[in-house]
């Protein structure tokens, strides 16, 4: 990527942080999103001495770093900027596949609560959120250690638990969502958080969680990227600006 592309990507990652915060997927100063710009360089949300939280992320908070945590270019870690302690979440996820360019490590409360309650996220609804139902149909794995993923070894453990799925629940912690785009990594997380919220509500009301009928999948089409990502993302960005 050239310098212009990198600057544009900073804007997108910062935007994604604000969207995730507005959606309640991360709170306060916790959580981070990244985007790979070359085989060993990524843009990632870093903290600084004047950080006011993820909901107020600026493009200048998105810093270019190497996979080893050092500055990716002169000045990138100046002015008190620090790489997240859980950088291995991002690095090991990206190392697992060249198709993974974006990683969102978030703390969605309903997902954490549902997992702790022993509730598996399954496709209990269809047209309410087709991408979310499809995601759940393939299964959502769980990394069963409630640790800060601050080492290469722990990052590899998480990636192993994730397997070939785009999202893994980190028990008592949060989730990691991976995708080819920053937007998709956040939208996947938002869909699963809504599914978890709905599942908790059904169980709390005394209901039973049941997968939709197999026959219904024939009439749950892929509405395409222009709708599922493009239109939805424009809404999320506009919504985040008003929260």
Swiss-Prot record:
Active-site feature positions: 86 (proton donor/acceptor)
Cited InterPro entries: Aldolase_class_II_sugar_metab (IPR050197), Aldolase_II/adducin_N (IPR001303), Aldolase_II/adducin_N_sf (IPR036409)
Induction comment: Expressed in phthalate-grown cells.
Enzyme Commission code(s) on record: 4.1.1.69
Pathway given in the UniProt record: Xenobiotic degradation; phthalate degradation
Keyword Signal assigned: no
GO cellular component: cytosol
GO biological process: pentose catabolic process
An example Gene Ontology molecular-function term: 3,4-dihydroxyphthalate decarboxylase activity
Catalytic activity: 3,4-dihydroxyphthalate + H(+) = 3,4-dihydroxybenzoate + CO2
Cofactor: a divalent metal cation
Binding-site residues for a divalent metal cation, renumbered to this chain: 86, 105, 107, 173
Keywords: Lyase, Metal-binding, Plasmid
Task of the protein: Catalyzes the decarboxylation of 3,4-dihydroxyphthalate to protocatechuate (3,4-dihydroxybenzoate) during phthalate metabolism.
The family this protein is said to belong to: Belongs to the aldolase class II family.
Protein name as it appears in the record: 3,4-dihydroxyphthalate decarboxylase
Organism expressing this protein natively: Rhodococcus jostii (strain RHA1)
Lineage: Bacteria, Bacillati, Actinomycetota, Actinomycetes, Mycobacteriales
Chain's gene name: padC1
